[in-house]
Amino acid sequence: MSNPESLKKQVEPPGYNELFMVEDVCNVDLEQGLDLCKPEKVNKQSQRSRQSRQSLFTNTIKPQKDKMNIKTNKIKEFLNDPFTEFSKFHNSYYPDGRISTRSNFRWPLLIIWSIIIVFAVDKKFEVQKFLSIWINENRFYSEIWVPIAIYVCLLVLMLLSLIFFAEFAVLALRVTGVIIAVLGAVLGMIIAVLGMIIAALGMIIAALGATITGLLYFGHWALYKLVILSLGFKIVTPGDVCVSNTLPTHNGETALHSETTVGSDIEQIELQNMPTPVKK
């Protein structure tokens, strides 16, 4: 019999004996004997359940929006990449501030360019000769000062034009570069369309070639049939042959045979394999 003291010393789960002393039996941890109806735990569990419900709600409703966002982002990247590459290329070849207003070499460069332009204009149109004739007729002629004044006036005009129109010239160059790039893109699209048209023509030509090949093959097959039928031959299908279709013929070839030739070949092979009788 079991000793009552030993029964008392047996290990029992904590709080098992106090189970019915707890007010809320449904919220009791049977292993630890603790009351689970604590406000902190209840609040945490309610918050977790709410968060899980919200996450399930958002995960069930928002995937389509996420897919749309991914597609739009891919389209934006596909459109932005060529634009950024073109802008880098264009900025490398047509940078801003090619004529810098803060450079120390601005005025000497402008003066040098003005002198070069004045001499080019004078050589082409003979401005000094024309103006000297006009001044001589009006009695303001001087062999030294008039040409100098003419060149100085031209130099000042060229210098002022370079000062005020340099930025416009740079912008004009950039705009022309953009125009050239756009024209090149349009030409590339036209060439791509022509390539597609050529590809379509190639497909049409390939289809015509396939039809011509099919017609030739059909004509060859019809001629073969006519020749076979006119010469009195019979075409044996593989289903009509009861043995292997690689049976050797009398001529040493491998071909299909009629029923009569197959039977004769089988008889010859059986006769060859039979043992020869021994003469006594």
Curated annotation (Swiss-Prot):
Protein name: UPF0494 membrane protein C750.06c
Species this protein is from: Schizosaccharomyces pombe (strain 972 / ATCC 24843) (Fission yeast)
Transmembrane segments: 107-127, 144-164, 178-198, 199-219
GO cellular component, one term: cytoplasm
Membrane topology annotation: Multi-pass membrane protein
Keyword presence, Thylakoid: no
Subcellular localization(s) per the UniProt record: Cytoplasm; Vacuole; Membrane
Keywords attached to this entry: Cytoplasm, Membrane, Transmembrane, Transmembrane helix, Vacuole
Taxonomic lineage: Eukaryota, Fungi, Dikarya, Ascomycota, Taphrinomycotina
InterPro entries cross-referenced by the UniProt entry: DUF999
